[in-house]
Regions:
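Fe(II)/2-oxoglutarate oxygenase catalytic core
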Residues: 1-147
Length: 147
């Protein structure tokens, strides 16, 4: 199912950008936060560990992260999972030991206006491939396997 606000989404599209937004010390602080967070998912088949950036675990780091994103994006709303209390998580950490399958993170609700993806690598090892193709449906994974 496609998003209902496709025209608005298309107006916000731009080419991918690589921006060195965080200092080495800030990346170190985010890495330390990652190491302190509980594992949310350990998908052994895909060899991925996922953790949620819990709000208020480190309030100064929360404020720094949001402030830095606003410098680049302006005002924004995160499309994230919610805690049991209804609070937004500041994103998900993915520690991947194998390539991720082809997927799109385009929001969960058809009325959402998807905006930008922010990827913050915490190590110099690894690559992210961004395709020029567009997908205007909700978040999904792609496969040629019909089963």
């Amino acid at each position: 199912m496609k998003h209902k606000n496709i025209d608005e989404i298309k107006k916000l599209e731009s080419l991918p950008k690589i921006i060195n937004l965080f200092s080495d010390q800030e990346i170190k602080n985010i890495s330390e936060l990652y190491n302190s967070l509980p594992v949310t998912v350990h998908n052994q088949k895909q060899n991925i560990i996922k953790k949620r950036w819990l709000q208020n675990c480190n309030k100064s780091l929360d404020a720094m992260y949001i402030s830095k994103l606003k410098e680049v994006l302006g005002e924004f709303k995160m499309d994230n999972l919610k805690s049991e209390k209804g609070e937004d998580f500041f994103g998900l950490f993915h520690e991947s030991f194998s390539p991720l399958k082809l997927h799109v993170d385009s929001g969960f609700e058809e009325k959402d206006i998807i905006f930008k993806q922010v990827v913050t690598p915490l190590s110099p090892i690894g690559e992210t491939i961004i395709f020029k193709n567009k997908w205007y449906g909700r978040s999904t994974s792609f496969t040629i396997d019909e089963d």
